[in-house]
């Protein structure tokens, strides 16, 4: 396990969230880690989920993997910090690296005034 610290002014095209390292958090991380462009970093009490461009936490997919209901309230319970634009919908939570990609969900006006 290595930790990287630092800052950069360039756009990273990354977004991510920290999940609690609990039985539910671990299953959610495993489902997300199986997706292309997603990297997991495990710590004793948390799991970082970092993705390129978009992270899509599909509640139906997570419900199937867990064998019990998963929804936005459970996502909020197992997550703490995040980076990127987070959008909660009835059926999923989305994290976008770019506000332009999230524009239709967050009311971000892309036209020049």
From Swiss-Prot:
Gene3D superfamilies xref list: Monooxygenase component MmoB/DmpM
Disulfide bonds: none
GO MF, any single term: monooxygenase activity
Induction (free text): By propane.
Family annotation (SUPFAM superfamilies): Monooxygenase (hydroxylase) regulatory protein
Pfam families the UniProt entry points to: MmoB_DmpM (PF02406)
Matching InterPro entries: MOase_MmoB_DmpM, mOase_MmoB_DmpM_sf
Family: Belongs to the TmoD/XamoD family.
Protein task: Effector component of the propane 2-monooxygenase multicomponent enzyme system which is involved in the degradation of propane via the O2-dependent hydroxylation of propane.
Record protein name field: Propane 2-monooxygenase, effector component
Species name: Rhodococcus jostii (strain RHA1)
């Amino acid at each position: 396990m290595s930790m990287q610290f630092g800052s950069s002014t360039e756009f990273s095209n990354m977004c991510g969230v920290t999940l609690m390292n609990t039985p539910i958090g671990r299953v959610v991380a495993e489902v997300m880690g199986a997706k292309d462009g997603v990297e997991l970093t495990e710590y004793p009490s948390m799991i970082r989920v970092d993705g390129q461009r978009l992270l899509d936490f599909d509640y139906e997919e997570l419900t199937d993997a867990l064998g019990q209901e998963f929804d936005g309230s459970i996502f909020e319970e197992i997550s703490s910090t995040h980076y990127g634009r987070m959008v909660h919908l009835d059926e999923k939570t989305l994290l976008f690296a770019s506000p332009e990609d999230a524009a239709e969900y967050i009311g971000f006006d892309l036209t020049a005034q």
